[in-house]
Design a protein with these regions (language model features):
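Conserved ATPase-coupling elements of RecA-like P-loop NTPase cores
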Residues: 75, 121-126, 143-153, 243
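Conserved pre-motif I regulatory segment
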Residues: 1-32
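Conserved nucleic-acid-binding Ia/Ib motif block in the N-terminal RecA-like helicase ATPase lobe
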Residues: 58-121, 253-257
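Single conserved hydrophobic/aromatic residue that forms the stacking wall/gate
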Residues: 277-281, 285-286
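Loop/turn-to-beta-strand initiation segments
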Residues: 61-63, 87, 108-111, 132-134, ...
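Walker A/P-loop NTP-binding motif
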Residues: 23-27, 43-56
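Conserved interdomain hinge at the start of the Helicase C-terminal
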Residues: 201-235, 241-246
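Post-DEXD/H (motif II) to motif III coupling segment of the RecA-like Helicase ATP-binding lobe
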Residues: 130-194
C-alpha cells in the first residue's frame, strides 16, 4: 500500500523520521513523535494509520484532532491525494455542522479530521458513532495545548470508550503530557535534534531593497523560482491585498489568504494552493 501511496503523492522516498514512525507503530503501543515543523509529520502518522485500518469495518475507525481548520483541510487534501479505498472527511467551526453531518452520513468515512470543539459537537450529537473509534491522533499537540483546547480534547477522549491506540505529534518537547490523553505503554520518538536538522532542511537568504522597489524586487525574486510553490508572508491584510494584485497584474498564478476573508474564500484559496496555484500570501497571523 505504501508504495502506491508514495507514487500517487510523487514522493520517491520517506525520511528517517517517517520510517521510524511506521515501524514503531507496528509494535502496538501508544506513540509520541517529536519532530520539527515541516519535517513531514503528516505522512508519519497517516501512513501507519492507513495500514491499521480495516477495510471491512463499519463506522469511523480513527479521529485526528488538529488545532485549526486550515490544518484539517490540508490533512484532508493529503489523505484524498493518497487515493486509497478509505474515505476521510474534515470538520471544523465556521460552517454549518448540519452540512458536515450530511457529509459524514453520505461518505461513511473511516477517518474524521477536525478541531476539538467541532469534534465534540458531532460526538455529543452522535453524528459519529463513538463505539467504532479505536485510534486517536492529535496533530500539533503542543499547539492544541497552547490554544487552550485541553478541556475540549479531554471531552473528546472521554467520549471514546473503545479507544485502543493514541498517536501524539508535536514540534516541541512538553515537560509533561496531561493525564487526560490516557497514554499507556508509550514509545517516544524524538527527532528534535534541531540545529543540525534545521540547517540541512532550511536555507536563509536576505534580499535588501529600497521600500519603493520592494514589489519589483519580489517579482524578480519569484521569477527565479520557476514553478515551485511559494508562500509570501506579509505583515498586514492590506499588504496581502496589494501584493496579490501586483503579482496578478504580472500574470502570476497567485492566491491570497488572510483573516479578514470569508471562510469560503479562505478555503478556496487554500485548496487552489494545494492543487494548482504556486504562490499564496498569508498574513503572519491569518
Amino acid at each position: 500500500m505504501i508504495k502506491n501511496i508514495l507514487t500517487n503523492l510523487k514522493i520517491e522516498q520517506l525520511n528517517a523520521m517517517q520510517e521510524a514512525a511506521i515501524d514503531t507503530w507496528k509494535e502496538g503501543k501508544d506513540l509520541i513523535l517529536l519532530s520539527p515543523t515541516g519535517s513531514g509529520k503528516t505522512l508519519a502518522y497517516l501512513l501507519p494509520l492507513l495500514q491499521s485500518l480495516k477495510p471491512d469495518a463499519k463506522g469511523v475507525q480513527a479521529i485526528v484532532l488538529v488545532p485549526s481548520r486550515e490544518l484539517a483541510l490540508q490533512i484532508d487534501q493529503v489523505f484524498k491525494s493518497m487515493n486509497t479505498p478509505f474515505k476521510a472527511v474534515s470538520c471544523y467551526g465556521g460552517r454549518p455542522a448540519m452540512e458536515e453531518h450530511r457529509t459524514i452520513k453520505g461518505v461513511q468515512p473511516s477517518v474524521v479530521i477536525g478541531t476539538p470543539g467541532r469534534m465534540n459537537d458531532h460526538l455529543s450529537k452522535q453524528n459519529i458513532d463513538a463505539e467504532t473509534v479505536t485510534t486517536l491522533v492529535i496533530d500539533e499537540f503542543d499547539k492544541c495545548l497552547e490554544f487552550g483546547f485541553q478541556e475540549e480534547m479531554a471531552t473528546v477522549i472521554g467520549q471514546l470508550p473503545r479507544l485502543k491506540r493514541r498517536f501524539l505529534l508535536s514540534a516541541t518537547d512538553a515537560e509533561e503530557i496531561p493525564q487526560f490523553t490516557g497514554l499507556n505503554k508509550t514509545i517516544k520518538l524524538n527527532f528534535l535534534n534541531t540545529e543540525e536538522q534545521t540547517v540541512q532542511r532550511l536555507h536563509l537568504y536576505k534580499v535588501l531593497s529600497p521600500g519603493k522597489d520592494k514589489l519589483e524586487t519580489l517579482y524578480k525574486l519569484l521569477c527565479t523560482l520557476g514553478s515551485r510553490s511559494t508562500l509570501v508572508f506579509c505583515n498586514h491584510r492590506e499588504s496581502v491585498e496589494r501584493v496579490g494584485k501586483y503579482l496578478q497584474s504580472k500574470k502570476f498564478q497567485c492566491g491570497i489568504f488572510h483573516g479578514g476573508m470569508e471562510q469560503d474564500d479562505r478555503e478556496r484559496s487554500l485548496y487552489k494552493f494545494l492543487s494548482l496555484i504556486h504562490i499564496s500570501e498569508p498574513t503572519r497571523q491569518a
